Curated annotation (Swiss-Prot):
It comes from the Bacteria. It comes from Paraburkholderia phytofirmans (strain DSM 17436 / LMG 22146 / PsJN) (Burkholderia phytofirmans). GO terms for cellular component: cytosolic large ribosomal subunit. HAMAP family: Ribosomal_uL11. SMART domains: RL11. Belongs to the universal ribosomal protein uL11 family. Part of the ribosomal stalk of the 50S ribosomal subunit. Interacts with L10 and the large rRNA to form the base of the stalk. L10 forms an elongated spine to which L12 dimers bind in a sequential fashion forming a multimeric L10(L12)X complex. The keyword Iron does not apply. One or more lysine residues are methylated. GO terms for biological process: translation. InterPro entries: Ribosomal_uL11 (IPR000911), Ribosomal_uL11_bac-typ (IPR006519), Ribosomal_uL11_C (IPR020783), Ribosomal_uL11_C_sf (IPR036769), Ribosomal_uL11_CS (IPR020785), Ribosomal_uL11_N (IPR020784), Ribosomal_uL11_N_sf (IPR036796). GO terms for molecular function: large ribosomal subunit rRNA binding; structural constituent of ribosome. Forms part of the ribosomal stalk which helps the ribosome interact with GTP-bound translation factors. This is Large ribosomal subunit protein uL11.
Amino acid sequence: MAKKIIGFIKLQIPAGKANPSPPVGPALGQRGLNIMEFCKAFNAQTQALEPGLPTPVVITAFADKSFTFVLKTPPATVLIKKAAKIDKGSSKPHTDKVGKITRAQAEDIAKTKMPDLTAADLDAAVRTIAGSARSMGITVEGV
């Protein structure tokens, strides 16, 4: 018989930098999960990613105090800001443009995000990324 699920915990943790301090410790502690075990497993799985890149994770907590977790792809906004080499998006996105990315950069981001997007194909994913970029005040050339 399958284990009884007692909840899901969604967190965004910098790659390779999970530690017992908030937000990780309190979120896992409430469910009675082993915090250090999660931190070690998360850091081991995110070694290949760029250190410090915010990585969403969904933790499934079971009644016997065990857990599993699934890593998601980094948020599109983080990848777009990195591609445009800016720190933050525009405060007035449709009037003040703060940067630009090319279609090739948008395609790279779309390929990275593809497992988490609902887009049917790469072209639809590129349009989704372009829309996110536009709402941040970033111009996408060639889309």
